Amino acid sequence: MPDQFDVAIIGTGAGGGTLAWHLARAGKRILILERGPFLPREKLNWDTSAVFLDNRYHTKEIWQDREGKELHPQQSYFVGGQTKVYGAAMFRMRAEDFGVIQHQAGISPAWPISYADMEPYYTRAEELFHVHGDLGAAPSIPGGFGSSFDPTEPFHSKRYPYPALANEPRMQSIENDVRKLGVNTFPIPLGLKRNEEDPLASKCVRCDTCDGYPCLVHAKSDADINCIRQIMHLPNVTLMTNSRATRLLTNSTGTAVTAVEVIHSGPGKPYGSALQPADTSAPPASSNGNPAIYTAGFFAVCAGAVNSAVLLLASANEKHPTGLANRSDQVGRNFMYHQADALLAISTSRNEDSYTKTWGTNDFYLKDPDPSYPFPLGQVQPVGSFHFEMMKGDAPPLTPGFVLEAMKHHAVPWWLTTEDLPDPDNRITLHNTTPLWVESWQSGLVGAHPAGDTGRTNQSEPVTDAAPGRIQLSYTPNNIESFNRLKDRWVDVLKKAGHATTSVPLHAYFKKRIPLEGVGHQNGTCRMGADPATSVLDPHCKAHDLDNLYVVDASCFVSASAVNPSLTIIANAMRVADHLLADRLK
């Protein structure tokens, strides 16, 4: 029986969406499976209480932490994945990040590819995701352009496709004053559809509801808007929403994946549900009926570092008793997501800026200024905006609202990131107990989508969906001393510049502290490498153990770096797509 599709892609986030966009435009027959619907376009997209206190766009799935306590992940299951609610900061990893780096807490290992291998794809990713940035009056250097702002910026073969966003008054004042102290600052590269020269013609309105919010006006460059909606109408593309992949099925020898098992939820009949693969018996019935089976020549798992590992572990069979691609026992291990926290810098000066995420510094990225501590610290950037409702969840119970409101008008929120290091004991495991039944979103039609169809995007009725067994996320923080030094360094800079009378960690008032629940930067659970004994994937992101299985999301990361991972995920998906088209899908 011929395969139904050339490639089946599981997940529509930064990796899956980009891979689908690239392969579909090359004319390949693509099946795209997304476990969630299209995110509803509604007023609540920009409602701070709904987004941050009610967790309207997070799954109701319950995971476990290392001790078995309940964990409520800030995970979004929609077309576009986590990019629907990300902050759109589009950083290239530093060239040094691809090599071995000694940290105070240990080694950040080398990748099997170099920055030079990735650079052309970074350039293409910046074009696809409409990235604004500025290298300044940088001289030409080998390979292209350097940066006159950021000494750590690697070479670019081309300048940014769109100009950087300008500062508003408060952020301009702070930037001027920290520069007087000798701090190098740079414009943050942002994936936003902003027209600074003609704001009236701009999709992006520089609102104060960007970081962590869905974009009501679709001005944020995400994998849904920039990728999936550009290809879903093509005759060679089948997009199925509300369709959760539960298992990958292999041939009798276990050398290749033959099919994906899918549970559809919601109205409508899923396309191809009666088909069965050649080398497997019918799967067991589920609570929603028999799972659908889809065959393809190649399979790309792009469900995010947690769920990609979960799918491989859940696909264990006689030939792969510990999970697919897990001969090395590395699937699920080396989970990373950054040591990161938000810091409120409070001063007597008022902050009336709407959007503050316009500049940052990497002066502490590669080294601490203290010569007795010759280790990297990390990156500093502002948060896009801050609302006092974000503090209401855990503020002291008698704190008056006007106090929180006053803090909002005198605070600038900063986001500090230090690399966390791969640790095999920081891992995802799947306990094959009775699945935990949860309430999750139901909006949109099941099955193939015609041109322009995004389902009933204003419906928001919860339905019952099952988590795939019990997911356990075991994590012990590392590199903490470097992170604490980074916070101290930045607070000291702000105080010397006159822009921080005091400071408080935002998690002191945030309903959910960033550790563990905040899995937006998840990576590393299916690391790539040349040695099958110590890695899951080869340098092209193909599983060492199976000939036609790829994992194309942040799971493949060997190290986390200290920058937002989105652009690297996108660029790597383009790199893998080129490999597939040149070498495998002829």
Segments the model singles out, each with a brief description of its role:
Residues 102-245, 518:
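Conserved redox-cofactor binding core of oxidoreductases
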Residues 559-577:
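A conserved FAD-binding loop/helix module that cradles the flavin
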Residues 1-124, 243, 262-264, 307, ...:
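N-terminal glycine-rich phosphate/pyrophosphate-binding loop and immediately adjacent elements
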Residues 188, 206-210, 246-249, 415, ...:
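A glycine-rich dinucleotide-binding beta-alpha-beta segment and adjacent secondary-structure elements
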Residues 104-107, 155-161, 209-215, 295, ...:
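Glycine- and acidic
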Residues 22-25, 36-41, 46, 234, ...:
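Glycine-rich loop(s) and the adjacent beta-strand/alpha-helix scaffold that form part
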Residues 67-74, 86, 111-112, 269-270, ...:
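FAD cofactor-binding and catalytic pocket of flavoenzymes
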Residues 32-33, 239-240, 551-552:
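Short hydrophobic beta-strand that contains or immediately precedes a catalytic carboxylate
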